[in-house]
Design a protein with these regions (language model features):
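A sensor for short, sequence-defined functional sites
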Residues: 22-628
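Bacterial Sec-dependent N-terminal signal peptides
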Residues: 1-24
Length: 628
C-alpha cells in the first residue's frame, strides 16, 4: 500500500467482484496499521496525511515497505518522518525528509514533477514506520486512491481511509472489500472506510487482476476546479468537456512547420495517405518518454514543444499528431483509454480509470476508424492492438466526451503456425529449416524483430523449446504491415520469419534404433505443481499449429509412431497426428486455447489437460536400421 502511485491517470480501477482474503498464505510482511486522511480545506486545496507501520518478516517482503511519493506543482511534500527498528536488536534508524531519494521527472521542462523514494534495509524481521503529509494546492481532480496492498503475500491487520470535506460538498466514491460509513458534524462531512485482518494475495500465472483481490477506495469531487480549469465529472460527457478545455491552444504549429507538412502531403489524394506520411514522420522524428507534465499530468504538451524537444508522452505525441493532421485537413479525436482493462465501471466516470491516450482517425475511404498508437509507431496503421481492441474508450470532443468501444477481432484470427523441415542424420544430429507465421496479436512481440541483435532473436525464437540449438540463423522476415489501404477494416497484421537451426542432439541413437522426438520445437503448456490459490483466467482464444516434415534417413525405416490423440476440454482443444508415407514422416499438432475462468478448486482438471498435451508434444517415434 505504500508504493502509492499518485499519478492521476496511472491507476487501475478494480472490477466490482467479491474480494477474497487468502488467509492461509504464508506472508512476507504485515501492515500492522495504516491510516490515511484527506482534509479538504477549500475546493482547490487540501492535506493528505499518512501514518503506517509495516512489519517485514522476510526479505521478499521488503518492497511492501518501500516508500514512493509523487509531487508536482499541485502537490508538495510538507513533512516526513520515519523509523526503522530491527526486531532482533540493533540500532533504531530515525528518518527525515533528507533521507529520501529525490528523482526529478521533468528535467528540462517547465514543471516540477518529482518522486521521493526510500527502500528500508537491514536484517529481518524489521519494523518500519512512516508519517508524512502532502499539501494539495491549485486544484483537486481526484482524492488519493487507496489500495490496501500492492505486493503479494502481505497481510493487513488494520487500515482506514477518510475523506473529510465541508458539509454539502459533493463527492463520488467507489470501494471494494472495505466497510464504509459517513458522519456529519461541526459543518464537516467525514467519509470513512475501514479494513481489518486482510490475509493478502498470492501471485500466480494466468490469475485474475490483482485489483479483484485487493481492497480499494476511489473518490473524487463532483466539481473540478483544477489549475484554473473548472468543470464537473458526473459522467464521461462532462469529463470530456473538461479535458477539451485543457487542450485549447495546444494544437497550434509554427507557420513554417505547417508549410513543411503540407509539402510532405502534396501528392496525397486520401486522408489515409496523409495519415501514413505523418505517422511515418512521427516515427522518425520523435520518441516516447513517460512524463507527468502539465496540469497534474492531464494536459498534453503543446505541439510546438513536442516538435522542438523531439519527444513526448502519450498525451503529447497524440496531440502532436492530431495537430499535424489538422494542418493537412484531416480530422481526428483525442482518445482516453486504459490499455490493460477493457471495461469501464458502469455508472462511475472518473479519470482514475484511464492510463493512456491514443488518437482516433476516421477514414471513410476504407470504411474504418484508425486507432493510432502514437507511443509506438511500430504498430502497423489500421491494427487495433491488444491493449485497445475491445476496450471501452472516451473520445474527447469540444462538446463533451463520447464513450464507445473499439471493435475487437474474432478469436479465430489469433494464430501462430510453425512449419519445420527436419534433415535428420544417422548419428542423431539434424538441420532444421523453419518458418514461423504470426497473425494478429501474435505479431506484437516481434514488431521490432528486424532491429534486434542475433542473440536476442535467438532467445525469442527458441523460447519454450526443449531443443538445444547449436546454431540459429534468421534467413528472412516479411510482413503485410502496409496492407491497410487495400484491406480496410478487415486488415489483420501478419509476419513470417524464416530461420534455420542445427543441433547435434535431435534424436537419441541406441544401436540400430533412433528415438526421435515428435515435436521438440513445441512450446509446452505451463502448469503449477502445488495447490492453486487463485482462479485460472484465460482472457482470449489463440491457436498454435505445428507442421513437421521429416524425411526418413536412407537405410532406416519406421518401427513405431505415436498414435493419434484428440482432446476436448473446457480449457482447450488439442489434436495430434503422425503418419509415414513414401519415406516421409508428417506430424501435425494443433492446440486452441479457449477463454474462460476456472475456480481454483478445479485446477486439477486444467493441470491434467496441460500434462496430456505436453505428453503428446514430448512423445517419440522410433526408427530402425534396415536389415537389423
Amino acid at each position: 500500500m505504500i508504493r502509492r502511485l499518485l499519478l492521476t491517470l496511472g491507476l487501475l480501477v478494480a472490477p466490482l467482484l467479491p474480494l477474497r482474503s487468502q488467509d492461509t498464505l504464508a506472508t512476507y510482511a504485515n501492515v500492522l496499521s495504516h491510516s490515511e486522511t484527506f482534509l479538504l480545506t477549500s475546493p482547490t486545496s487540501g492535506e493528505w496525511t499518512v501514518d503506517q507501520s509495516i512489519l517485514v518478516t522476510n526479505p521478499k517482503g521488503r518492497s511492501a515497505a518501500a516508500l514512493i511519493i509523487y509531487t508536482d506543482s499541485f502537490r508538495r511534500l510538507t513533512s516526513f518522518s520515519g523509523e526503522i527498528t530491527p526486531i532482533g536488536g540493533g540500532k533504531v534508524v530515525k528518518l527525515k525528509q533528507k533521507d529520501l531519494v529525490y528523482y526529478s521527472l521533468s528535467e528540462g521542462l517547465a514543471d516540477d514533477s518529482a518522486r521521493w523514494a526510500y527502500l528500508p534495509d537491514g536484517p529481518c524481521p524489521l519494523l518500519v514506520h512512516y508519517t508524512y503529509k502532502v499539501t494539495y494546492r491549485n486544484g483537486i481532480a481526484s482524492f488519493p486512491s487507496f489500495l490496501a496492498v500492492m505486493d503479494e503475500k502481505v497481510r493487513v491487520t488494520k487500515a482506514s481511509y477518510t475523506v473529510d470535506v465541508p458539509e454539502g460538498f459533493a463527492i463520488k466514491h467507489l470501494s471494494g472489500g472495505m466497510d464504509y460509513s459517513s458522519e456529519s458534524k461541526d459543518g464537516r462531512e467525514r467519509h470513512s472506510w475501514t479494513l481489518k485482518d486482510f490475509g493478502g494475495y498470492a501471485e500466480e500465472e494466468s490469475m485474475p487482476s490483482v485489483f479483484e483481490l485487493v481492497p480499494y477506495v476511489y473518490a473524487s469531487p463532483v466539481s473540478i476546479d483544477y489549475g484554473g480549469y473548472s468543470g464537473t465529472q458526473s459522467d464521461w460527457k462532462e469529463i470530456g468537456c473538461w479535458l477539451a478545455q485543457l487542450q485549447e491552444g495546444r494544437q497550434e504549429l509554427d507557420p513554417q512547420q505547417v508549410a513543411q507538412l503540407q509539402e510532405m502531403c502534396r501528392d496525397c489524394t486520401t486522408d489515409l495517405e496523409r495519415l501514413q506520411v505523418l505517422y511515418r514522420y512521427l516515427r522518425n522524428t520523435t520518441r516516447y518518454v513517460s512524463l507527468q507534465f502539465g496540469i497534474g499530468g492531464l494536459q498534453p504538451m503543446a505541439a510546438t514543444e513536442v516538435f522542438r524537444m523531439g519527444f513526448g508522452d502519450c498525451k503529447g505525441l497524440s496531440n502532436y499528431l492530431r495537430a499535424m493532421l489538422a494542418a493537412v485537413g484531416v480530422a481526428s479525436d483525442y482518445t482516453i483509454i486504459h490499455n490493460r482493462r477493457a471495461n469501464l465501471l458502469p455508472g462511475y466516470a472518473s479519470l482514475e480509470q484511464m492510463n493512456h491516450v491514443m488518437l482516433a482517425v476516421p477514414l471513410p475511404e476504407v470504411g474504418d476508424t484508425a486507432w493510432v498508437e502514437c507511443t509506438n509507431p511500430l504498430y502497423p496503421l489500421g491494427y487495433r492492438h491488444s491493449g485497445a481492441a475491445g476496450h471501452q474508450v472516451v473520445l474527447v470532443h469540444n462538446e463533451g466526451g463520447e464513450q464507445i468501444r473499439i471493435p475487437g477481432y474474432p478469436d479465430s484470427l489469433s494464430r501462430e503456425v510453425q512449419h519445420t523441415q527436419v534433415s535428420l542424420s544417422p548419428d542423431g544430429s539434424a538441420h532444421l529449416t523453419l518458418r514461423r507465421e504470426l497473425f494478429l496479436d501474435h505479431v506484437e512481440p516481434y514488431l521490432d524483430f528486424r532491429n534486434l541483435k542475433p542473440d536476442v532473436r535467438r532467445s525469442i525464437l527458441t523460447r519454450g523449446m526443449k531443443l538445444q540449438a547449436d546454431e540459429l540463423t534468421v534467413t528472412g522476415v516479411t510482413d503485410n504491415f502496409d496492407a491497410y489501404a487495400a484491406e480496410g477494416r478487415g486488415f489483420v497484421p501478419e509476419m513470417t520469419i524464416d530461420y534455420t537451426m542445427s543441433t547435434r542432439l535431435y534424436a537419441n541413437r541406441n544401436g540400430d534404433r533412433m528415438f526421435v522426438p515428435l515435436n521438440p520445437v513445441a512450446q509446452m503448456l505451463s502448469s503449477q505443481k502445488g495447490k492453486r490459490i487463485n482462479d485460472l483466467v484465460f482472457k482470449g482464444s489463440s491457436v498454435y499449429e505445428d507442421h513437421i516434415t521429416l524425411p526418413i534417413p536412407e537405410g532406416w525405416h519406421v518401427e513405431s509412431l505415436p498414435k493419434g490423440e484428440k482432446l476436448e476440454t473446457a480449457w482447450g482443444q488439442f489434436s495430434s497426428t503422425a503418419s509415414a508415407e513414401n519415406g516421409v514422416i508428417e506430424i501435425r499438432q494443433v492446440i486452441r486455447l479457449l477463454p474462460g475462468r476456472t475456480p481454483a478448486a478445479e485446477y486439477d482438471g486444467y493441470r491434467a489437460f496441460a500434462r496430456a498435451v505436453n505428453k503428446c508434444y514430448a512423445a517419440t517415434l522410433v526408427l530402425k536400421k534396415d536389415g537389423e
